[in-house]
């Protein structure tokens, strides 16, 4: 199990602690909502969705979080400015914890920032993400807002080695800091299987070892384009879930503090797997600390039986 020499920074958002040493705090799980193709989605442009089914998904995830001790964060996607506003508004009224908001559209991300500012939600909202493609308008909106927490996505198509990936991360973290963001979560970026998947796991260790920042990762992206699980003679949904679970616990073992596991509908499978590995990490770290004579509080899994 991994024990880092450098200090590991942490911060709190509500009742949830981000960062810290491996095993010190429970792994945070981030479930996605309102992405195209999800059963809850009705109209991506207008931001309409099945509120009853969405609430069922949230209730299930909250129950699993309570039973395992692993915190839950919601990842909200919005295709348009109207959609991101509708989604954030509804989630802020129907979920008490922190949430991430994002879009592939820069104008939509800016509207998300503006809405959170207008609604006083920056004590809960996390911006995803500041990266090499961030526009000047986004950066200006961030500087003019009360945004406290953001993800720094350290990915570049030119960064194909650990050294290059780390330099990209350092550059983006520096940019995030200059924009006035207090709480920075570093994300090395996840590539699909066959297109670089795996380097981000090595990069996670380097990030924690060298920078000591809270980390997050979206390993569910790895099997997203994996042709192996899309063969006609396979139960594709079953294999997709298995792949998401496997990629999630791999990231957990490689010291990710927060893990985006894709669709919230997979909460039961993902939380159960992470709880199991959480027990393994707890026992391994306790033994390592005893051997190294380190006195530090550790997360005690609720599922230790």
What kind of feature is each model-predicted range?
Residues 1-6, 72, 99, 123, ...:
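N-terminal start-of-chain detector that recognizes signal peptides
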Residues 9-164:
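Active-site beta->alpha loop and helix N-cap motifs at the rims of alpha/beta catalytic domains
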Residues 84-100, 104-107, 111-122, 202-222, ...:
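Alpha-helix-loop-beta-strand connector modules within alpha/beta enzyme cores
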Residues 39-53, 177, 278-290:
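A signal for specific C-terminal beta-sheet/loop modules enriched in small/flexible residues
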